[in-house]
Amino acid sequence: MKKEDLRIVYMGTPDFAVEALQCLVEGGYNVVGVITMPDKPAGRGHKIQYSPVKQYALDHQLPLLQPEKLKDEEFIQALREWKADLQIVVAFRMLPEVVWNMPRLGTFNLHASLLPQYRGAAPINWAVINGDTETGITTFFLKHEIDTGEVIQQVRIPIADTDNVEIVHDKLMHLGGRLVIETVDAILEGKVKSIPQEEMAVAGELRPAPKIFKETCRIDWNQPVKRVYDFIRGLSPYPAAWSELVNPEGEAVVVKIFESEKLPKVHTLAPGSIVTDGKNFLRVAVPDGFVNVLSLQLPGKKRLKTDELLRGFHLTEAFKMKAV
């Protein structure tokens, strides 16, 4: 079968999913329809905002469906009418069997980890938070349990000690577009030899990648300096690690921290204690050193470098970060 004859339905929502869709369209593959999340109000004005995948589909006149419920009969019928040979899922939702089992060649997913590691909603964040030095991207066929299907292909990349989640996200996004094309071509050529995940070698224990909530992002200053440093970069710039900054009167505000340095050092200060000259630097004590805060954000303010913030905010060593 030629690629022009292979009927592909594509499912995805965020920017991460646009790259692979763009690679398919620009590569001359036959994308017969796109499925994305319903429109949602966003921002302070609650204006209706299209998902990045919807915007791309509209810009390129691709047929589009935005089901509220994936088991809805009208949606299922509309999907059947597209007569897909293959479905591709990138950063979308958990699909019911009636959807993923529909095409004759199956449905494959692009997942931003080296499966079976980091099954779940936030694999890039957790790989950085856990201080991993390597991650990657995987294509696999869908089955009942989430992120457990047979692996088709994988690509590995290093994680530098200075990478934050945005940098790793963008690297994987670009790699993912190419891997989707390679996977489609392998399926077209009948060269796929998928591997059950339980047969794949894994270094160390399996780690999950659960969805990240606000409380997940609270910094625990009782942790070692490297752990806190990795935690901050694993949540930067979004959704952002945060802590409560407590003034001498005991009043607290939430401060988001985006960039830091690790400064291992022996000291006797309590975790969360602040060391600052009030002008140029802000360091927070942890048991085995200090976290040097390089950029942060106060409520209702924009993100600033530490020295910029200190010029407009009178911070002394009588302040502290709530250790948790």
UniProtKB/Swiss-Prot annotation:
HAMAP family: Formyl_trans (MF_00182). It comes from the Bacteria. Keywords: Protein biosynthesis, Transferase. Belongs to the Fmt family. It catalyses: L-methionyl-tRNA(fMet) + (6R)-10-formyltetrahydrofolate = N-formyl-L-methionyl-tRNA(fMet) + (6S)-5,6,7,8-tetrahydrofolate + H(+). CDD domains: FMT_core_Met-tRNA-FMT_N (cd08646), Met_tRNA_FMT_C (cd08704). This is Methionyl-tRNA formyltransferase. Its EC number is 2.1.2.9. (6S)-5,6,7,8-tetrahydrofolate binds at residues 113-116. Disulfide bonds: none annotated. One of its GO terms (molecular function) is methionyl-tRNA formyltransferase activity. Pfam families: Formyl_trans_C (PF02911), Formyl_trans_N (PF00551). It is an enzyme of class 2 (transferase). PANTHER family: METHIONYL-TRNA FORMYLTRANSFERASE, METHIONYL-TRNA FORMYLTRANSFERASE, MITOCHONDRIAL. GO terms for cellular component: cytosol. InterPro entries: Fmt (IPR005794), Formyl_trans_C (IPR005793), Formyl_transf_N (IPR002376), Formyl_transf_N_sf (IPR036477), Formyl_transferase-like_C_sf (IPR011034), Met-tRNA-FMT_C (IPR044135), Met-tRNA-FMT_N (IPR041711). Attaches a formyl group to the free amino group of methionyl-tRNA(fMet). The formyl group appears to play a dual role in the initiator identity of N-formylmethionyl-tRNA by promoting its recognition by IF2 and preventing the misappropriation of this tRNA by the elongation apparatus. NCBIfam families: fmt.
